[in-house]
């Protein structure tokens, strides 16, 4: 497995580490998303402890309005985080 493929598998595994806790095993509830963000993205997303921030992120990600974030919706967050990280690297 290449380094990139290994990282992709890691992202999937982290998603599932949190998605299996409550409700459907392949989606994140708001509580699961908050736990993932506050644990895994604490240095990347500002105000992760603020419930209003988590609510806004969840609302933005939940494109179909089912009160769950599936993997495809979660990828929107990762894409945004990666773009910001890439831009920040070039600022340094």
Curated annotation (Swiss-Prot):
Listed InterPro entries: EF-hand-dom_pair, EF_Hand_1_Ca_BS, EF_hand_dom, S100/CaBP7/8-like_CS, S100_Ca-bd_sub
Keyword Transmembrane helix applies: no
Topology in membrane: Peripheral membrane protein
Keywords: Calcium, Cell membrane, Copper, Cytoplasm, Cytoskeleton, Immunity, Inflammatory response, Innate immunity, Membrane, Metal-binding, Repeat, Secreted, Zinc
Domain of life of the source: Eukaryota
GO BP, one annotated term: antimicrobial humoral immune response mediated by antimicrobial peptide
Binding of Zn(2+), residues: 16, 26, 86, 90
Iron listed as a keyword: no
Annotated Ca(2+) 1 binding sites: 19, 24, 27, 32
Free-text note on domains in this protein's UniProt record: The hinge domain contributes significantly to its chemotactic properties.
Quaternary structure note: Homodimer. Homooligomer (tetramer or hexamer) in the presence of calcium, zinc and copper ions. Interacts with AGER and both calcium and zinc are essential for the interaction. Interacts with CACYBP in a calcium-dependent manner.
Name listed for the protein in its UniProt record: Protein S100-A12
Organism: Oryctolagus cuniculus (Rabbit)
Gene that produces this protein: S100A12
């Amino acid at each position: 497995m290449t380094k990139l493929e290994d990282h992709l598998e890691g992202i999937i595994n982290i998603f599932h580490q949190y998605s299996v806790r409550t409700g459907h095993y392949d989606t994140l509830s708001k509580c699961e998303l908050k736990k993932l963000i506050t644990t895994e993205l604490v240095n990347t997303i500002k105000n992760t402890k603020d419930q209003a921030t988590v609510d806004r992120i969840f609302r933005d990600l939940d494109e179909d309005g089912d009160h769950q974030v599936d993997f495809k919706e979660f990828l929107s967050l990762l894409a945004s985080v990666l773009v910001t990280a890439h831009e920040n690297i070039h600022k340094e």
